[in-house]
């Protein structure tokens, strides 16, 4: 691979509270197809598991969140690192309550723009609403797996 083609993406993989689009917190940009959502709903209902994160963008004016993530990344080696020869992934685990709270505060009031995963996000909303209608509560059903990047 030509080193000139290298790219680096810094993201935060986390759970995000499901928000109805009308609330203006999580914003879509494309239409979705019913058949694809039905497939995903059946899978989520059967497994109660997010297999793939929603990829979302946020604005980090001033770069505070990015700097926080870089600082966390530089405090220890990655927990997981793997490569297929072309793409390398490195994952760090953040379990420091102070760091987690700082990141939560960074994202409070910030809009998230779905770049990839509209069908999965809408499926998460439907699943959450179905459980609410049944009076059922499952830990995590109010959240969805998301990767956030600026």
Residue ranges and their predicted role:
Residues 1-150:
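Surface-exposed, charge/polar-rich loops and edge strands
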């Amino acid at each position: 691979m030509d080193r000139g083609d290298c790219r680096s993406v810094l993201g935060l993989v986390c759970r995000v509270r499901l928000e109805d689009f009308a609330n203006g917190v999580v914003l879509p940009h494309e239409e979705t197809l019913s058949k694809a959502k039905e497939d995903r709903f059946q899978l989520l209902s059967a497994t109660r598991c997010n297999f793939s994160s929603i990829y979302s963008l946020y604005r980090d004016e001033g770069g505070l969140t990015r700097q926080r993530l870089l600082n966390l990344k530089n405090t220890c080696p990655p927990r997981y690192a793997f490569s297929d020869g072309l793409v390398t992934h490195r994952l760090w685990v953040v379990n420091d309550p102070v760091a987690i709270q700082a990141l939560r505060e960074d994202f409070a009031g910030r809009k998230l723009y779905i770049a990839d995963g509209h069908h999965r996000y809408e499926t998460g909303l439907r699943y959450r609403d179905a459980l609410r209608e049944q009076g059922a509560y499952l830990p995590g059903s109010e959240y969805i797996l998301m990767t956030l990047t600026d």
